[in-house]
Design a protein with these regions (language model features):
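A short coil-to-beta-strand element that immediately follows conserved catalytic motifs
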Residues: 15-25
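Single conserved hydrophobic/aromatic residue that forms the stacking wall/gate
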Residues: 1-12
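Beta-rich nucleic-acid/ligand-interaction surfaces
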Residues: 23, 28-35
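Amphipathic alpha-helical recognition patches that constitute DNA-binding helices
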Residues: 7, 25, 47, 107
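Short, conserved, surface-exposed binding loops centered on an aromatic residue
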Residues: 16-18, 37-41
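Catalytic core of Fe(II)/2-oxoglutarate
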Residues: 32, 39-45, 52-123
Length: 123
């Protein structure tokens, strides 16, 4: 039944996104950028990034993920048109250690959030 399918689509990993808003950001980081390990605010229900690597930057420029003791456990490769998504929580540590950016590190970030933006998700 289509309403059941729609209802399932609005839930990701036990997160009800039906009353959320979509927030889209175009990001362009340059040399010197870094982002200390952090967990997202609780108002950010889901985060996703799509990498836009048009300048053949190093694959090492992807997002770093950490364990609870802030040991780096994975770097998502910074490949063109490649990305990830995750739901926020108390152990979703991520950031980016200071790395060499030759020209620029571009990304498109799409978040589902609880606060109002221009794009309401219809339930």
């Amino acid at each position: 039944h289509s309403s059941n399918r729609r209802q399932r689509q609005m839930c990701i990993r036990d997160r009800d996104l039906s009353n959320s808003y979509v927030r889209l950001e175009v990001i362009c980081d340059r040399e010197g950028f870094w982002l200390k390990p952090h967990c997202d605010i609780e108002e950010k229900l889901m985060s996703s990034i799509v990498f836009v690597n048009l300048h053949n930057e190093s694959e090492n420029l992807g997002t770093d993920f950490y364990d609870a003791k802030l040991n780096k456990v994975k770097t998502v490769p910074y490949k063109h048109n490649y990305g990830y998504f995750f739901t926020s929580g108390p152990n979703t540590w991520h950031g980016m250690e200071k790395k060499e950016i030759k020209k620029e590190r571009r990304c498109i970030q799409i978040n589902y959030v609880t606060f109002e933006t221009d794009w309401k998700v219809k339930s």
